[in-house]
Amino acid sequence: MAKAFLSLACALSLGACVMPPSASEKASDAARELNLSARFGNMDVAAKKASTNARADFVQRHALWGSRIRVVDVELAGMNMPDSDHAVFQVDYSWMRTDESTMRTTRVTQRWTSLGGAWAMESEERAAGDIGLFGEQVEVLRPVQRNAQFATKVIRED
């Protein structure tokens, strides 16, 4: 009886290992790999996940990451698959400029396509949040530097 139960348990557990990943799982893995690689500065790995048509634009838009822009966190916030070969991801970035301490957030929409089983990002655009993540020209207002000392008065009696 124990042998039969053990054999049945092994057969059922081995059957679960044979299931290939679904299209949504493959798309999620590709999007996660691109965004985490970009966050940690591995732009060569991240750029390989962009389609050949979008690669040059991707590299240009992320050129300031690691030098003037520090990406603090990235999160896949949502996913929509209109069909098995296309996916749309909502990605939330927390970031800051390296010369200031203000935390900013931006939501980005990424469009992905399956090319023969391999997923590639076709486009990305800012959907909401702070401007400047992709190197857009932003006028940064800085406070006027004031003299931190009090005015000095000299009192003399001659």
Where do the PLM segments sit?
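Soluble periplasmic/extracytoplasmic beta-strand elements of cell-envelope proteins
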Residues: 88-92, 111, 120
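Short, cysteine-centered beta-strand-loop-beta hairpins and adjacent loop/turn segments enriched
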Residues: 95-104
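Short solvent-exposed beta->alpha transition segments
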Residues: 22-23, 28-29, 36-90, 101
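Hydrophobic/aromatic beta-strand elements that line small-molecule binding cavities or substrate pockets
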Residues: 75-79, 107-112
